[in-house]
């Protein structure tokens, strides 16, 4: 496709030392859910290894005796299970007095404490099991309504690994490699210096340091930076390649990456009742547009789909207009209390302007 606008504004931080560029690497937060998790499940669906109607326990046997085990995975992707939205996993490491529990965290790396949170904070290497246990035991808010929840996406890496016989990171990494991407990855400090990566937040409640080059989401950090709910880093251009492949019916540079029928299935409205319209993993336009409830443009077609991210990221694809809109920011810098992106509705206004540039 042709780029309508490709602009970069501002600096990595308020000291104005490093300008933002098209090569700046961002923590894309919940865009991970569609750009890694859903993407991987689509590939497995293509390969007849992943089945939407199968229950969660079909893929993860440890959930067999839980109240989540019989729920079809399709319902998790549609966010229609009623399971709670999230669990503050970082708080599970603390006692009631706010102090860290013994045998949970250490200020030094060792074989036992090998999950890197900061250079002076390491998590017990098997704590992922505790995260899974919390998900198994957590409650449902309302089983009769759609409630956005990120908890299933913590489980996607294990599902992908079991089905593909590869680690989640390697499996989705192979998809990125087939698209010639090299800045779309987890734990980017393994490959890039900090000055290529935009920092997110100055954490003053858990990791007690600037979060820079490691995932902002606390739960994903506790999964060693590789999770299905958050953890992916990328650039606007590389995200554009992924979603242009969607608009190209699964093709990239003449190579078939996905079946067009799979793209159509996952991005169409699979749950369209009342005020809830959802694709498989993807957000869809609401039946009635509301500036207070919608990040996407009022001009978006019913065929459009996308997702937003907590750190100030957004992707929206509109097949009717052959349009991809990608917005990356570090809106949580220096603190997540920074709400100006929402207050001024910046993402949506830019999206409107883009549509207006060719709809006139």
Protein language model regions, located:
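Active-site-proximal beta-strand/loop segments in catalytic clefts of secreted hydrolases
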Residues: 1, 9, 79-81, 283-285, ...
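Extracellular/periplasmic catalytic domains that process cell-envelope and extracellular macromolecules
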Residues: 19, 66-70, 140, 273-275, ...
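Short, surface-exposed loop or secondary-structure junction motifs
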Residues: 68-302
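Residue-level preference for non-acidic, small/hydrophobic
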Residues: 1, 33, 37, 41, ...
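A short, well-structured edge-of-sheet supersecondary motif
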Residues: 1-19, 117-125, 182-184, 315-318, ...
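Structured C-terminal helix/loop/strand segments within mature extracytoplasmic catalytic/sensor domains
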Residues: 307-360
């Amino acid at each position: 496709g042709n780029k309508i606008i490709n602009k970069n504004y501002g600096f990595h931080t308020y000291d104005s030392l490093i300008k933002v560029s098209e090569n700046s690497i961002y923590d894309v937060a919940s865009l991970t859910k569609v750009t890694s998790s859903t993407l991987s499940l689509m590939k497995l669906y293509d390969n007849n290894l992943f089945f939407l109607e199968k229950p969660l326990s079909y893929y993860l046997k440890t959930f067999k005796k839980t109240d989540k085990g019989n729920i079809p995975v399709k319902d998790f992707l549609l966010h229609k299970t009623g399971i709670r939205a999230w669990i503050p996993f970082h708080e599970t490491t603390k006692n009631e007095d706010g102090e860290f529990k013994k045998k949970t965290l250490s200020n030094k790396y060792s074989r036992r404490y090998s999950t890197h949170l900061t250079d002076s904070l390491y998590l017990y290497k098997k704590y992922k099991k505790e995260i899974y246990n919390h998900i198994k035991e957590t409650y449902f808010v309302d089983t009769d309504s759609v409630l956005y929840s990120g908890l299933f996406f913590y489980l996607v890496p294990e599902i992908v690994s079991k089905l593909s016989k590869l680690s989640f990171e390697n499996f989705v990494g192979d998809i990125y490699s087939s698209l010639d991407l090299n800045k779309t990855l987890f734990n980017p400090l393994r490959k890039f210096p900090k000055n290529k990566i935009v920092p997110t937040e100055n954490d003053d409640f858990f990791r007690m340091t600037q979060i820079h080059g490691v995932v902002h989401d606390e739960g994903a950090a506790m999964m060693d930076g590789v999770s299905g709910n958050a953890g992916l880093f990328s650039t606007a251009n590389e995200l554009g390649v992924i979603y242009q492949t969607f608009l190209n019916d699964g093709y990239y540079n003449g190579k078939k990456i996905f079946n067009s029928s799979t793209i159509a299935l996952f991005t169409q409205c699979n749950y369209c009742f009342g005020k809830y319209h959802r694709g498989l993993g993807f957000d869809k336009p609401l039946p009635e547009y509301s500036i207070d409830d919608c990040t996407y443009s009022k001009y978006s077609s019913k065929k459009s789909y996308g997702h937003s991210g907590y750190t100030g990221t957004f992707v929206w694809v509109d097949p009717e207009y052959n349009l991809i809109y990608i917005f990356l920011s570090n809106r949580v810098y220096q603190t997540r209390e920074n709400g100006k992106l929402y207050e001024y509705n910046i993402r949506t206004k830019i999206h409107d302007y883009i549509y207006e540039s060719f709809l006139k």
